[in-house]
């Protein structure tokens, strides 16, 4: 049975593009991206969606009095679109528990580090890679996980390690992790979900 996917974004949408490309190659199983929802007007991710013929929506954070008000509006929109899977792809909003309650084990996020390292409140974008380099790790990578009420705390679906090199800058490491891990892991996880190959037992995710 086909599954409707909504991708939530705030910026350029490089992970969205990886999903669009995978969809074009028939690599999302029975899943179809039917909506791209941005928290910012003018986000380039909306242009990516338009070029792919995917409907775009904008829910500007500044128009809502609180994150909860925005979350409730988002849930209404998702339900109206009959969404089965929500993917956070560079979305900078911390949604409240109502979203998780509406979509238990049906919201995926990609994080640019190997959780539980360099994750949680405040760890996003280049800052993650700055902290990894500052700590001196030899491996970093990416994690795709289900979203829970705890920031970056949901069950881990997939991880991929990426080498950290002595001359890396945060920007160089970010690019390598995107290319070698994020853009591969996320479409694979979405495909597994859409093919009903994922089961969750407590904190353990099993992919058949």
Q: Locations of the language-model features?
A:
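One-carbon transfer enzymes
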Residues: 1-208
């Amino acid at each position: 049975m086909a599954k409707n996917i909504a991708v939530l974004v705030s910026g350029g949408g490089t992970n969205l593009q990886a999903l669009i490309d995978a969809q074009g190659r028939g690599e999302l199983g029975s899943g179809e991206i039917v909506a791209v929802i941005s928290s910012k007007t003018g986000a380039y991710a909306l242009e990516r969606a338009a070029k792919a013929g995917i409907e775009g929506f904008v829910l500007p954070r500044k128009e809502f009095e609180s994150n909860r008000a925005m979350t409730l509006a988002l849930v209404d929109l998702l339900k109206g679109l009959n969404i089965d899977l929500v993917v956070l792809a560079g979305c900078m909003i911390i949604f409240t528990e109502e979203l998780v309650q509406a979509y238990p084990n049906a919201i995926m996020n990609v994080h640019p580090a190997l959780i539980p390292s360099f994750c949680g409140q405040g760890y996003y974008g280049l800052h993650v890679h700055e902290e990894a380099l500052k700590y001196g790790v030899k491996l970093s990578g990416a994690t795709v996980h289900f979203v829970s009420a705890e920031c970056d705390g949901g069950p881990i679906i997939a991880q991929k390690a990426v080498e950290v090199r002595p001359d890396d800058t945060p920007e160089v490491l970010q690019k390598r992790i995107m290319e070698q891990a994020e853009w591969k892991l996320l479409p694979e996880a979405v495909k597994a979900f859409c093919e009903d190959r994922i089961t969750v037992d407590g904190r353990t995710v099993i992919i058949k």
